[in-house]
From Swiss-Prot:
This is Iron-sulfur cluster carrier protein. Homodimer. Pfam families: ParA (PF10609). GO terms for biological process: iron-sulfur cluster assembly. It comes from Rickettsia conorii (strain ATCC VR-613 / Malish 7). GO terms for molecular function: 4 iron, 4 sulfur cluster binding; ATP binding; ATP hydrolysis activity; ATP-dependent FeS chaperone activity; metal ion binding. Gene3D superfamilies: P-loop containing nucleotide triphosphate hydrolases. Keywords: ATP-binding, Hydrolase, Iron, Iron-sulfur, Metal-binding, Nucleotide-binding. Binds and transfers iron-sulfur (Fe-S) clusters to target apoproteins. Can hydrolyze ATP. PANTHER family: IRON-SULFUR PROTEIN NUBPL (PTHR42961:SF2). ATP binds at residues 105-112.
Length: 319
């Protein structure tokens, strides 16, 4: 009989929600596994007691679907106003082996282009790949892949759009062309959770997350709530780009996410070697320096595969 592990528990209950929109996974802690017996606590501070009991029964029913489970113990806790919050367990994304972020502190450096290139190249190498466009306020992935359709849903799950053999999800699929998304941080963070965890991924080897610029709420939400395998940093030769990228590097180092490497985009136009300088200063591998060419811009505008123009030495950095 196989041993139980925490991921099985999280996967089974991750879609259970309270009426206020709180996901059960956001308020559980102290997961204990002893043989075939499992238990954990639910923080029901501010929740209706009857609803909490309904949620508990739903969780028990879902967990009983795991054949190895014998006994389930779920207890309720309530935090005192000044009580330090117990660190939440990080979520695994169902049916995804590895999650790689593509990030930069600076906007307009080509994160979406590089996210697309990485995904396309991995797909050509026979990996199963998906992309989450996490740039809520400026989604570019639908344009790069030429997608103009709204994803279907099945059994309450979002079915990602398939383009160039890559599974793709973006907030851009759900808004009208050129419409501004005017959301505060908590709403944007909740949307990211839904794009990651409510989407029905099909046994992916890699999920690439195209991050927004900056180091704000969305970054913290993803970093604090998900098991991640690393981040690729994108920069350009300009000094102002380097300044913002340093802030991004600082964020990922403080939160202990492995920085897999740096890609310098729009290279060779200026003498400043931002990617090489950052690589040496922070002891981070320089994966590649990508030239700025009209062909790359044209490929993005016409939704053509970027792998016809470029190849990155990815595999030794993503293992």
């Amino acid at each position: 009989m196989a041993n139980l592990h925490q991921r099985q528990i999280i996967d089974k209950i991750q879609h259970i929600t309270f009426k206020d929109g709180t996901f059960l996974n956001e308020v559980i802690s102290d997961i204990i596994i002893k043989g075939n017996n499992i238990g954990f606590s639910i923080d029901i501070s501010g929740k209706n007691k009857l609803e909490a009991e309904e949620i508990r029964l739903k969780a028990i029913n879902k967990l009983n679907e795991i054949s190895e489970v014998n006994k389930i113990t779920i207890v309720f806790t309530e935090s005192k106003p000044m009580e330090k919050k117990v660190q939440k367990p990080k979520h695994f994304v169902e049916n995804v082996k590895k999650i790689i972020l593509v990030a930069s502190g600076k906007g307009g450096v080509g994160k979406s282009t590089i996210s697309a290139l990485i995904a396309q190249q991995l797909s050509l190498a026979n990996y199963r790949v998906g992309i989450v466009d996490a740039d809520i306020y400026g989604p570019s992935i639908p344009h790069i892949f030429g997608i103009n359709e709204v994803p279907q849903t099945k059994d309450g799950r979002i079915i990602p759009v398939l383009a160039q053999s890559i599974e793709i999800i973006s907030i851009g699929f759900f808004v009208k062309d050129h419409s501004a998304i005017i959301w505060r941080g908590p709403m944007a963070s909740k949307t990211i959770y839904q794009l990651l965890s409510v989407t029905k991924w099909d046994n992916l080897d890699y999920l690439i997350i195209d991050m927004p610029p900056g180091t704000g709420d969305i970054h913290l939400s993803i970093l604090e709530n998900y098991h991640l395998d690393g981040v690729i940093i994108v920069t350009t030769p300009q000094k102002i780009s380097e300044i913002d990228v340093i802030r991004s590097i600082d964020l990922y180092q403080k939160l202990n996410l492995p920085i897999l490497g740096i890609i310098e985009n729009m290279s060779y136009m200026l003498k400043n070697n931002s990617g090489g300088h950052l690589s040496q200063k922070y002891n981070i591998p320089l994966i590649a320096q990508m030239p700025i060419t009209p062909q790359i811009a044209e490929a993005c505008d016409k939704s053509l595969p970027l792998t016809n123009l470029l190849t990155l030495p990815l595999e030794k950095y993503l293992q």
